[in-house]
Amino acid sequence: MDLTTTSHARVDSGGVPFTSSLNDPTPPKLSASIALPAHLHLLAKAYGIPESHILQLAWALAANEQNARTAQWEHLELDERQAISWVLRHWQDPSVHRYLSPDELRGDKHQIPATVMAVVEEYSLFQTLALTGSETEIGMCFHPSTEQPWLRVIWNPEGMLASSASRLTRALESALHAVFLTPHVKVGDLTLFSIWDHQQILQWNSHYPQATDRLVHELFKDVVDASPQANAVAAWDGELTYRELDRLSSRLSGRLQDEFGVQPETIVVLCFEKSVWAIVAMLAVVKAGGAFLHVDPQHPAVRHQAMVQTTAAKLVLCSARTRSIISASVPECTSLVIDRRAFSVEPDHVQHETLLSSQNLSPRNAAYVVCTSGSTGTPKAIVVEHASLSTSVDAQANAMEISSGSRVLQYAAYTFDVSVGDIFTALTHGACICIPSDWERSHDLAGAINRLNVNQACLTSTVASILSPAEVPGLEKLTLGGEPATRQCVDAWAEQVRLKNVYGPAECTVWCMIQPEVSRHISVSNIGHGIGARAWIVHPEDHDRLMPVGAVGELLIEGPLVARGYLNDSTRTDEVFLSQPPRWLESFGPTPSRSRFYKTGDLARYGPAGALLFEGRKDTQIKLRGQRIELSEIEYRLHRALSDQVATAVELAHPKGSTAPVLAAFITWDQGIDLQNVQNVTLDARQEFEELASRIKAEIEQALPSYMVPALFIPVQTLPLTTSGKLDRKSLRHFCSQCSHEFLKKLDDSSPADAAPKESANPAEENLARLWAQVLERKSESIRRGDNFLSLGGDSLAAMRLVNLAARDLRLTLTVADVFNSPILADQANLLRPLVQTKHIAPFELVTDGDLPIQDLMDSVAKQCGLTSDQVEDVYPCTPYQEEMVRDSLSGTRTQMGQEVIQLASDLDLSRYLSACARVFQRCPILRTRFVEISGKLLQVVIREDISWQRPTSLAAYIEADNQTPPTLGKPLARWALTEDSTHLVLTMHHAIFDGISLGQIFGAIYAVYQSIPLPQVNLTFATFIGKIYRPHHDLPDASKQFWRSYLSPTAGSNDAPLSDVERASRPCANSGTQRLVTFQAGAVKALQQHGLTEATLARAAWACTLARGRQSPDSDVIFGTILTGRNIHLPGVDALAAPALAHTPIRVRMAAAQQEKPAHFLARVQADATAMIPFEHDGMDRIRALDEQVRVACDNMRTLLVIQPIPEGLILDSKSPFPGTMLSGPRVEAREMRHFHWYGLLMECTLLPMDGFFVRMSFDDTLYSPEAAERLLDEYSQTLHELAHGLTVDGSTE
C-alpha cells in the first residue's frame, strides 16, 4: 500500500523553500510531506541542540495553537513571555522531547502515547506502526539530510479525520516557518494564521447578514393584515386570532401610554405564569414603545429586587395569581393585573391609535431586556433593540422553517430568552404559538403537545430526552438548543423528525448559529453556520488575532442581531461588546459601519465546510439544563455567607457513572478531604460541616434561583492551585469525575460510613426507589426510605422525569408539587395514586354496540332530523338527567324549555355581536344538539349546521308563540331570535342542553369573542364526559343498589305525608316566584372553611332544618330532591364543560340527632353523606326509583327541589338575578322564574355569591302554596342559614 502523496514545491514570502502535499486537489488520506530548509542542521548547531528538538518545538507550537492551550496540550506549559529563540535554548519538555528508536517502535504498541509526536529516522517503521493498528493517532517521521531534509506527517485514519490531520500539518508548516524566520517573536505573539486560512474563512464569511431594520410589531402587523383570522395563540387558557391579538395588545398599549407614561426606553416588568395574557402583555409593551423584562414568580424576592434595581423599572404587568408575589418583592413598583377583566371596558380606539402612531419610536430603541447571571452577584441586564429582534426573527424563521403552517410549542421559561424567539418568530411569520400550562409543562408535556397539535418545538436536550418520538407522533420538527446536544438525544430523534441544533447567547438575540440537518453521523458539538450573523474564531486573549482553521479559539459573533450591551454597566459592556471592529476585518471586504461584535466567551473551532464545533467555555460561565450560570456569582454568594478565612470554589461536576452534571461547592475545612489522596478518604461523621452546609444553602436560596444552588457541598483541606497560583479548576473537575454521586453526597452527610442497614420498605417505596435511581442515576439499593429527593440531586427537571416515569411505568399519578412538598421517599410513596387517564371518545364510539351498523344508524338519525347523513357530526347516549328532561317534555305535561330575553345595549356593535354568537354556536356542540329515538332508546345528535336567526317584528307576540312551541324529536333545541328593530335577543333552550355553569360558559364565550378576548382551549368533550358515566345496560351496578337501598331505607320517623288527590291528578308546576339576597356576618365563610365545610353543605342543611320545622314531628328524617352540578367526578376539564352535567338525586337528612348536635357536627354529617354519594350521583332518578317499592315511595313523596349552584365564571349579579348577558347587553326584560321545570311544587335555587352569602330564588305552584306562605318559607330558610352560620362562629363550634 502506497502511503505517499504527490508533493508540490512552493516558496513562502520569506524565501524559504518548502514542499508540501497539502495543495493537492485530492485531500491526503494517510500522510503528507514537508520539505525542510537545507540549513536546518546549521540552525540546530547554532543553538546547540539536535535537529529533532527544533521539529518538536514546532510540533508543540502547532498542537498548542490548534487546541487553544487546553486539553491534552496543557502540560506543554510554553512560556508565552519568551522569544522562540530563548525557548529553543531552554525548553525541555520530557513528554515530547523524546527520541523513539526503531527498537522502541518495534515493541508494544500500547506503550506509545496517543496523539503525541514520535520522531523516527526510518519511515518504514512508522508505516508499519500505522498499518498494525497503533493507538497513536498522529506522528511525524523525520529524515535528516544535509542536502534535503524532509518531514512526513502520518496519521491513523481510524483515530483522526484526514481534514483534522491536514489542518494540524498546515499549522506545523506555519510553526516551522516561524521558528526558521522569526525566532525573535515571543511565543505569546506567534500566529500561525496563514493565507490559506484567510482564503478559506473569506469563502465562508463572504456575505454580511441581511439586516431587518424595522419595528418588530410592524412585522406582526404585516401578518395581521394578511391573515387576520388565522390562529395566533393557542394556549391552555385561551385562543386568539391575529386580529384579536392585535386589538387586545393595541388597547393595552394605549392604556400603558395614557395611564403609566410608557414611552421609548421605558422598561416594564412582566411577571406571569404560562398564559395567553403574557403574550398580550409582551406585544402591548413593544407597541407602546417600551421594553419588557420578564421575572420568574418562583425566584426569590432578592432576585426580583436586584433585577428591578438594575433596570429602574416602575411598572409591573402580572396575573392575578402572581400579583401578591411581585407586590411583596418590589412594593415600590405599580402592579397591573392583565387578564380578561382588564379589557371589560371598551377603549377609545381612535385615541389609542393616535398615541401609537405619534411615538418617536425607532428600530434603535429597546424591545426587551433579559437578565442573566452576573459574576459580581448583580444580574447583567442585556438590552436588545427592535432592529436586532426583527433581524433575528427573520433569520430564524427562514433557518428553522417557521411559517403559516407551523404550530410552535412555547416551552421555555419567560426569563429564558429562547421564549422571545419562540413567540416573536411565530407571530411575525404567521405561525401559531402553542402554550401549555405550567402544570402540563411539568407533568404532561407529551399530552399538551398532542392536544395543542404542535408540529414544531425547540427544547433543550434534557427536556427532549424526557419525551419519546412515539409519544408525540404529530411533532415534525425538533430544534435542540440552550445547552450542548447529547448523543443519546440525537440518536433518539434524528431519524424520527427534522432535527436541528442551534446555538446563541442572549447577547445575540436568541439564536445566531444553526446546524439545520442533524443526523447520527454528525458530531453533537456541530452548531453549524451563522443565521443573521457571521462567526469568527479569535485568540482567547486577543480578539485582534484570528485563529487558523481548525484551531480552538473564542467565538466572536458579528451582525445586526448583536445586542446593544448591558444596561447601566459600561464596564462589563466594554469587556465583551467591541467598540471598534477588529483590525483584521478590513481584509475581508466592506462591512456596515454599525456592525456589532460580541465576544461570547465560548470556545469553538471551524469544522468541515466551515461549520463550527462547540468546545466549551474559556471562563467560569457554564450552562446547566439550558440556564446560563456564572460560577463566580455563586462563589460571590458563598463568600458573603462565610468568613474570610474560608476559601470556596464552585464547579460543574460530572460524577463517575452519571450523565447528569451537578453543581458542586468546595469549601475549605480542617477535617476536609485531601484531593490528592482520594483513595484513603474516611467518611467519619461531620455533623458540624453538615450544619454549616445547610446554613449556607438556606442563605443562598434566598438570593439565587434554585438552578444556581449547589447540589453538593464538599469539604476539602485546601483548594488546588496551578503553578501560576490560580485556582486549578481542572483538578476539581477531575476529582468529581473519579467519584460516584453517592460518594460525593456522603462527603457532606453526617451519617457514618457504617450506618445501619437499609430499612425495610413496602412495595410502593421499592418501586418508587427504582424510579428515583433511574432519574438520579444512582443504584436503587443505595436509596433509603428516609432519603430526600432534592438532597440526592433532584431538581425540577428530575421531578418532571419522575412524574412521567411513574405514569408510564407504574401507572401511578404523582405531581411535581408532590415531589417538592414531600421529598422524602416514604412520604412520597404515600402520595402515589392510580393513574386516571381521560380516554378520548371518537365520533360514534359510544353507539357502536347497538343493533344497527354505524352507517345505517347515521341514515336513520338523519332521516328523523330531516337532514342528510353527512350533516351528522356525532351520536352518543344521553345522561340520565337529559333523558328525564326529554321524556318529561315529550309527555306533554311541560315543555322543559328555558327562555332568556335580553335587551341589547344601544351602543352594541350588532354585526360583531352576531358574529360572536355564530362562532360560539360552532364552538359548542351542545348548541347544535338534537334528540332522536332509535329502537326505543333516546340518543343525542350533533349536527353540522350554522346558526339560524328568527327576526320577529313583535317581541311580545314572539315570546307568547315561542312559549307555546313544544320541543320535538329531531328538531333544534336552541332557538335564536333577534327582533326586527335589533333591540332584543331571545334565546330559548331545552333544559336537556344546558345548566347554570354551561350557560355561563356559553354567554361568557360570546362576551369574550365580542371583546376579542381569548377563549380557553377545549380539553374535554361532552362525549368524553358521557363515556365516563355511561352505563350501557339499564340496571344499576351492585354497589349503586346497595348504596341507595341503605340511604333511602325506611326510618322510625314519618316521612312527608302521602301525595294529595290534587297532586296525584296533576303534577305540580312551579309557575310563581319570589327571591331574596342572603348575606352572612363577617367571618361566617371563614368559619366554614376552618371546619372543612362548604357553603353548599350549609345551604343543604339549612333547607333540611326549614322543612323539618314545618312537620308535626321535627325529628323525623327529611327527604327532598336536588339537582347536583354533576362535576365532582375526577375528570380534568369537567369544571369548564359547556354542556349539562347535572344529576337529579334524592337527599335524605337524618334529623333525629340534629337537636342535640352542635352546628359543626350536624353540618359535617350532612357533608359526609354528600361525599359518600359522589360515586353514585349519575345513577339517575328513574333507575333509583326502579330499585324496589320502598325506594320508589321515598322518591315519589319528595315535594321540594333544592338546586345549589355557583355563579359561573363571567356572570354578573344585577339588581334582580345573576344573568350571563348583563356585561354585554344590559338588564333582562323580566326576572322569569324557571317554570315548567320538573314536577316539584316548590323549587329553591341557591346561587353562591363571592361576597359571603346566597342569592335565593323560590319558584312555586300557586295552587299549592300561597304567595304569603312562600314568603314565610323563604324567611324561615334565610333565618336558618343565619343561625347555622352564626353557630360556627361562636366559640369555634358551639351553638
Curated annotation (Swiss-Prot):
What is known about what this protein does? Answer: Nonribosomal peptide synthetase; part of the gene cluster that mediates the biosynthesis of the tetrahydropyranyl antifungal agent restricticin that acts as an inhibitor of CYP51 and blocks the ergosterol biosynthesis. Within the pathway, resC catalyzes the C3 esterification of restrictinol with glycine to yield restricticin. ResC represents an example of the emerging class of single-module NRPS-like enzymes that perform esterification reactions.
Q: Sorted alphabetically, which NCBIfam families does this protein's record hold?
A: AA-adenyl-dom
State its cofactor: pantetheine 4'-phosphate
Q: Which family does it belong to?
A: Belongs to the NRP synthetase family.
Q: Which GO terms describe its molecular function?
A: ligase activity; phosphopantetheine binding
Q: What is known of its domains?
A: NRP synthetases are composed of discrete domains (adenylation (A), thiolation (T) or peptidyl carrier protein (PCP) and condensation (C) domains) which when grouped together are referred to as a single module. Each module is responsible for the recognition (via the A domain) and incorporation of a single amino acid into the growing peptide product. Thus, an NRP synthetase is generally composed of one or more modules and can terminate in a thioesterase domain (TE) that releases the newly synthesized peptide from the enzyme.
Q: Which SMART domains match?
A: PKS_PP
As recorded in UniProt, coiled-coil segments are none
- Which EC numbers does the record give? 6.3.2.-
Reaction catalysed?
restrictinol + glycine + H(+) = restricticin + H2O
Annotated stretches, region: Condensation: 873-1284
PANTHER family recorded: FATTY ACID SYNTHASE, NONRIBOSOMAL PEPTIDE SYNTHETASE
Give the protein's recorded name: Nonribosomal peptide synthetase resC
Q: Which residues carry this modification: O-(pantetheine 4'-phosphoryl)serine?
A: S796
Specify the Carrier domain's residue ranges: 759-836
Q: Which organism is it from?
A: Aspergillus sclerotiorum
Taken from the UniProt entry, a GO cellular component term is: cytoplasm
Chain positions covered by the region annotation Adenylation? 221-624
**Which UniProt keywords are present, listed alphabetically?**
Ligase, Phosphopantetheine, Phosphoprotein
